[in-house]
Amino acid sequence: MKYTMQLISRDELKRKLERKDQFKLVMALGDWQYRAKHIPGSLHFPTLEDARAELAQDDEIVVYCSNSACPASVLAYEYLVRHGYTHVRRYAGGILDWEEAGYPLEGEMVAAKTP
């Protein structure tokens, strides 16, 4: 299957979250990584099959992982597209890019802000 991977920028993703747009933000890493640190509002599924069971094919979906070199979001993107999902985009920068911009994260490894 030939396709062009659809990407979303950090700033566009931030705007979508701020506007509370209707879309599914999916972290494509393991459970321990999700528990440690993720973008607020993210969903996590133990397997890609679980994601397919929970996501509608016409949902707008953004997948991400840890950074631009991480293959997990590429694999999740390709899997969803191959299974008929039509509105999938990849946030290539991932958690590292989000955190470097100073945007909020949630999870057990996120430092608490001091007043």
Give a label for each model feature.
Residues 1-34, 106-115:
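Flexible, polar/low-complexity N-terminal or interdomain linker segments that lie immediately upstream
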Residues 8, 44-46:
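Short acidic-hydrophobic, aromatic-tinged amphipathic segments that line or gate anion-handling sites
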Residues 16-17, 49-58:
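Short amphipathic alpha-helix with an adjacent loop that forms part of the alpha/beta core around
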Residues 17, 38, 102:
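Short, flexible helix/strand-to-coil boundary loops that buttress conserved ligand/catalytic motifs
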Residues 19-25, 40-41, 86-87:
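Short active-site oxyanion
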Residues 34-40, 52-56, 98:
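Short loop/helix-cap segments at secondary-structure boundaries that form the rim of catalytic
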Residues 43-44, 61, 104-109:
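Short, hinge-like loop/turn segments at secondary-structure boundaries
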Residues 55-99:
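Catalytic cysteine-centered active loop of the rhodanese-like fold, especially the PTP/DSP P-loop
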